[in-house]
Amino acid sequence: MFGSLLYFSSLQRSVSTPAREDGGAPIRSPFDVFLERNGLPQQPNFNESPIDHSRRLRTLVNAPGFTPQFVTSNPNRADGQFQFHSQPFEFGPTELDGLRMFLAEPAGPVASPAELAAGKIGKCIACHAAPNFADFKLHNTGTTQKEYDAFPSHTGGASFFSLPIPTLATRTANDLPATEQHPTASDRFRSIPSDTTTLTDLGVWNVFANPGMPAPQAKIRTILCDGQVPCPLSDAILLDRAIARFKTPALRDLGHSAPYMHNGQFDTLDEIITFYRDTSDLARAGTLRNGAIELQGIALTAGDNASLVAFLRSLNEDYQ
C-alpha cells in the first residue's frame, strides 16, 4: 500500500530525460497544466488529507469569481500535443464540468431524490481523491456481482447476492487459493464464474485470515476495520466485510491501462461510469452484496457520462 503511494508520488515528480523534445520539463497531464495555469493547488498542504485537498479544490473551481484559463496545447512539446496518446492535449469547459462532477458530494451519505434527479454528483473523491486519485484501500464496487450475474448459466434464480459463501468457521483450505501448503486447493472463489455457479472471484476474501498468506494481514485488517487500531472486530466479521473487495485503482493515465477493473470487465470509460450509475442504484436498494457505502452517494444521469469521461481523459500523461 505505502509502496504504491510512493510510486505514484514519484510519477508526479518525474522528469523526462534532456534528450526528449520537452527539454526535461516535468511530465504533466492536461489537468495538471490547468491547475498550474489557474493558480490552483496541485498538492495537499502540510497535514491536509487528499480528500480535504480535493474539497478545497472544489470550493475554488466553484467560486463565483473563478474565471478559468483553459488548456489547448501541451506546453512541453513543440507540436503542443501528446507524444503517446492520440487525443488532443486540452482541458476545456467539458473537462471542467467533469472535474466539478468528480469532486461533488451529496448533502448526506445517501443521495436524495432531488439530487438523483439533478445528477452531476460523482462522489468520486471518496475513493479517488486528488492528486494521486487512489486511496490505496479495498472496496467492493459491484464488479464481482455484475460478472457473476451476467452468465446465462446463473439465471433461473441464482444470483451473487444469494450465493452461499463460507464463513471463517466453515472456510476450508480447499476454498482458498492454492499455496505450497495446499497445492491442490480449488481456487473456486478466485475464478471466473463461467462454468458453474460455485465459481466466482471474492477478491481479498481469499487473502484475509488465510494462514498461507501471513505478510499482508495487518494492513488488510486495518483497512477492513476502517482504520481502527487495535481493531475491535473479530476475524469472522472482517471476513464478511472482505467479500468481493479489490484494491482501488489509480486514475492517472487510464489511456494506457484498458481494459478496466481487476478482471478487464470494461473496454471504455463510458462503460465504467454507466456501471457506477447502475451499482449505486443497487446499493441504495440494498441489493448489492457487501457494496461500498460510498456508492449510495453517487447521483449521476446518462447525460453526465461525457463530461466525466472527458475529465478522466485529461488525467492522461506521456508515460509509456
Question: PLM ranges: what are they?
Answer:
Residues 1-320:
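Periplasmic c-type cytochrome electron-transfer domains
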